[in-house]
């Protein structure tokens, strides 16, 4: 691979020499930082198994190398990368995989390291959604995830990725993460805090990442990280698991933050060693049992991951000062709930007892049952998935619900050709050689739902959301 010029402040290099174990080569660190980052993907097992995905893409000639800490993760090499961006392939558009850096798959692997089954999980700094969607896949779309993002501009991207991946068990919030310890004390079985950091590990992706770096800014960031970790630890139930991670390399934002928590809460904090997380994990293991991943170790981004357990309850933090406001939804029950369920089932939309029906005026929503006890304690930006809008003739089913809930083997499913699927993603109506018999059509490609549509004569009317419509070269080059 060609090298690219990375900007390294002298003080950063001095700090890295001090932080790096003697078993690692500093020259190899510099060399690794200047190599372009390998592309990697994570297969979305909510939609397809790893084996079925590998069989599906076998004709494309993609070279996939397994990522040792993530069964569904692969480094990818493609000869057609310049002609067809990875994000424009049919498999990406339908949510079969997520483009995710390999080392960023580590925190979720650590969160589920004991094959535990948490029912209520918080991702405290969630955008753009790689780890939230990975958590949802590990949970099998059951239970509930509170995905929080402080940056308002990134909440929309977070929702778009959750929707594309067919995830139904998520609630979105837009808060400074420091509120949750007080607002939702000891409410979560597991919490991921992928903390905002100085980003020293991302220089392979962004050669100018360290342009504004300074030792002083590291200390300022670490102070914020301690406050976020304190909040997360208070929001974690006794016996629960917390993973703290960053994409930076200095000790102040990594080991020192975790050791501060241990010093503050003593026996309430137990560090859970990660040396057995995957074969060769011991190469990045610290004396405390954390993983401090320098980029040359596994040829990936620099990363840090710590896993801990909360051993006992803590005194409550002061109550939050904000007002939640009236909750605008009411549960849908009895005959009304039955009518909605039967109408949805008739067009191929199915769900289980993990999701409950709620309504707001003419809108019908599905909320994860596990999140309902948090209603009234925190204000949600978005909760669950919007199932439908009611009107005089029935229900107008929503795109995100179709992607998450549709059964591709339903009697009304209509499989498109590659050329027709490309037309669909361009927002155009479909004129199949043999039109479907049903008026309500579940449009599929590669046996994945693309949307619900109406048949009008010999035409299938396009219902793909306008904001998702694509142009430029699409995926027919793969067919």
Curated annotation (Swiss-Prot):
Q: Which InterPro entries match?
A: Methyltr_RsmF_N, MeTrfase_RsmB-F_NOP2_cat, MeTrfase_RsmB-F_NOP2_dom, Nol1_Nop2_Fmu_2, Nop2p, RCMT, rRNA_ssu_MeTfrase_F, RsmB/NOL1/NOP2-like_CS
Which Pfam family is one of those matched by this entry?
Answer: Methyltranf_PUA
Keyword Transferase attached? yes
Residues binding S-adenosyl-L-methionine are 125-131, 149, 176, 194
Xref: PROSITE patterns: NOL1_NOP2_SUN, SAM_MT_RSMB_NOP
Q: Please list the residues that make up the active site.
A: 247 (nucleophile)
UniProt keywords, alphabetically: Cytoplasm, Methyltransferase, RNA-binding, rRNA processing, S-adenosyl-L-methionine, Transferase
A biological process (GO) annotation for this entry? rRNA base methylation
Q: Looking at the UniProt record for this protein, which Gene Ontology cellular component terms does it annotate, in alphabetical order?
A: cytoplasm
**Entry keyword annotation includes Cell membrane:** no
- Which locations, inside or outside the cell, does it occupy? Cytoplasm
Q: Which reaction does it catalyse?
A: cytidine(1407) in 16S rRNA + S-adenosyl-L-methionine = 5-methylcytidine(1407) in 16S rRNA + S-adenosyl-L-homocysteine + H(+)
MF terms per GO, please? Answer: RNA binding; rRNA (cytosine-C5-)-methyltransferase activity
EC numbers listed for it are 2.1.1.178
Q: What class of enzyme is it?
A: transferase
What does this protein's UniProt record list under function?
Specifically methylates the cytosine at position 1407 (m5C1407) of 16S rRNA.
> Could you tell me which PANTHER family the record lists for this protein?
28S RRNA (CYTOSINE(4447)-C(5))-METHYLTRANSFERASE-RELATED (PTHR22807:SF30), NOP2 YEAST -RELATED NOL1/NOP2/FMU SUN DOMAIN-CONTAINING (PTHR22807)
State the similarity comment: Belongs to the class I-like SAM-binding methyltransferase superfamily. RsmB/NOP family.
Q: Which HAMAP family match?
A: 16SrRNA_methyltr_F
Name assigned to this protein = Ribosomal RNA small subunit methyltransferase F
């Amino acid at each position: 691979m060609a090298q690219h010029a990375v900007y390294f402040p002298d003080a950063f290099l001095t700090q890295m020499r001090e932080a790096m174990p003697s078993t690692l080569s500093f020259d190899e660190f510099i060399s690794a930082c200047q190599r372009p980052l390998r592309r990697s993907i994570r297969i979305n097992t909510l939609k397809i198994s790893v084996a079925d995905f590998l069989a599906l893409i076998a004709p494309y000639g993609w070279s996939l190398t397994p990522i040792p800490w993530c069964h569904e993760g692969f480094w990818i090499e493609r000869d057609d990368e310049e002609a067809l961006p990875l994000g424009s392939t049919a498999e990406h558009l339908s949510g079969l995989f997520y483009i995710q850096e390999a080392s960023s798959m580590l925190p979720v692997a650590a969160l589920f390291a004991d094959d535990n089954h948490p029912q209520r999980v918080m991702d405290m700094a969630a955008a753009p959604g790689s780890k939230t969607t990975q958590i949802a896949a590990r949970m099998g779309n059951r239970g509930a995830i509170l995905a929080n993002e402080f940056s308002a501009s990134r909440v929309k991207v977070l929702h778009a990725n959750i929707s594309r991946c067919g995830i139904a068990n998520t609630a979105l919030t837009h808060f400074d993460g420091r509120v949750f310890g007080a607002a939702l004390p000891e409410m979560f079985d597991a919490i991921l805090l992928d903390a905002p950091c100085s980003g020293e590990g991302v220089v392979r992706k962004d050669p100018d990442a360290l342009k504004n770096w300074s030792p002083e800014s590291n200390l300022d960031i670490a102070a914020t990280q301690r406050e976020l970790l304190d909040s997360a630890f208070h929001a974690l139930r006794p016996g629960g698991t917390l993973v703290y991670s960053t994409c930076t390399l200095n000790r102040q934002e990594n080991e020192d933050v975790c050791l501060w928590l241990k010093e503050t809460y003593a026996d309430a904090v137990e560090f859970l060693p990660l040396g057995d997380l995957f074969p060769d994990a011991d190469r990045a293991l610290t004396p405390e049992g954390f993983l401090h991943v320098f980029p040359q170790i596994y040829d990936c981004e620099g990363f840090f991951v710590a896993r801990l357990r909360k051993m006992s309850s803590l005194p409550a933090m002061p109550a939050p000062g904000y007002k939640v406001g009236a909750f605008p939804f009411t549960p849908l029950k009895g005959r009304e709930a039955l009518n909605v369920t039967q109408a949805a089932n008739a067009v191929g939309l199915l769900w289980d007892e993990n999701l409950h029906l709620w309504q707001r005026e003419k809108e019908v929503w599905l909320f994860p049952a596990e999140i309902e006890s948090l209603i009234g304690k925190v204000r949600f930006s978005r909760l669950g998935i919007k199932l439908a809008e009611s009107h005089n003739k029935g229900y107008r089913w929503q795109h995100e619900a179709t992607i998450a809930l549709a059964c591709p083997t339903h009697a009304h499913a209509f499989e498109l050709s590659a050329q027709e699927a490309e037309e669909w993603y361009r927002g155009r109506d479909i004129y199949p050689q043999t039109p479907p018999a049903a008026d309500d059509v579940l449009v599929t490609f590669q046996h994945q739902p693309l949307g619900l549509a109406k048949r009008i004569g010999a035409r299938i009317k396009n219902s793909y959301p306008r904001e998702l419509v694509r142009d430029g070269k699409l995926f027919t080059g793969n067919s």
